[in-house]
Each structure stands twice: as structure tokens, then as C-alpha cells.
Amino acid sequence: SFGVSQLPDDILQVYKPLLKRFNKILIREVTGKTLLHTQLGLDSQVVLDPTFLLSRSQWEKMANYPLSKQQKYILSFQIINRDVHYDAMLDYLHRKLGYEVIELKDSFRYKPWKWPIYAKAGPKEFLGLIKNAEMVVTNSFHATVFSILFHRSFFCSRNSFGFNSRMENLTGGLGLADRMFDSSTFLHSISDTDVVYEKVDEILEAKISATKQIIEKTFAK
């Protein structure tokens, strides 16, 4: 996975001889497949991120729930610095839905603390916080993945650094392109806060089946 749609020339010179050593390349985004073909002349196949190859119930068994299951909250998790419009967007969702906002961060050093911060989450708590949220707002690929697996309402914020392609491919490929937004225009472009997962699950099940077949065929050789 590259996370971008184009690589600079200096990186290409490093990647090309190394990638040519592989018999087969599997990649988790369509833009990555295009990048490999157009910039490096290499063929690849698109598969799902491995997290999708475990079922929802398998992930649920691993989850810990650090907050009360009765508590209703919007979970905010940003792995890349937010822009100036992000807090206004969270405030809008807080007022619209009436739920508290919980910020998932790696420490308490972030200031000002507009919302309550949860800074003690390991992998199990990460799963539980997403599973129990009424809504997830994030720019994290895997927070998006688990929001989908756990059937959470969610929004993905684009970042100004350009690392958006893998989330755009993920949401677009599942019919969830309207979940992607720019925080500067969010208030003017917000779609329904709920996600209808029936169709999403149909698409996802087909992609999971195809991914497993590709992996099995690859390792059978």
C-alpha cells in the first residue's frame, strides 16, 4: 500500500529493483495498482486489507470496552494533525446528535482540551471504543475499516498532506464515497449521518471471497 497516487523519481529508483524481485504483488488500493503499472511497469492484483479477512465476531471477541456500554459518544481519532475547521465540524455533530465527543489520542500533551481525551487505549481498547461509538470521525485507515466492520456511522476527513487515496479507494469501492469529506466544506456537504450497511455487506462479502481466492491461488503455486 502506498497511500498516494504518485511517487517522486528518487523513490521510484529505490522501489523498482526491489519490487521486481517479487513473483507476485498484491496491493490494497486501485490507485496503487495504477501507480505500479504506469510508473514502474509492474503488474499487481488488488485485494482487501487483511483486517477484513477476520469476521466481525472474531474482532468483537478481542475488544475491551473502557467506557460504559450505556455511554453514547462520538469518537474522534486523527492520526494526522487536524486543520482549523475540524473542531467546528465536531461541534456541529455534537449539537446535531446530542452525543459527547471523546478524543482518542496517544497522550494528554495536546492542548487545548476542548473534548474529553482517552489516551490509554491499546489494540483491544481501540476496537472497543470504535465498536461502542455512536459515530466515528477519523482520518485513520484502520479506524475506518473497523467502523465498517462494526457497522458504525462514520465520516473520514481528508488531510492536506495528500495521503487520502487508500481511504478514498476503500470507501468508494464499498459505495461509501459520501463518507469522505473536507472539514472546511463539511457543513455544506454533509450527507445523512447514518449508514445503510445491507448493500455494503453484499459488496464486502464478494470482495472478501475474491481476496481469499487470490491469496490461496498465490500460495498454492
Positions of PLM-derived features:
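Active-site anion-handling motifs in enzyme catalytic cores
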Residues: 1-221
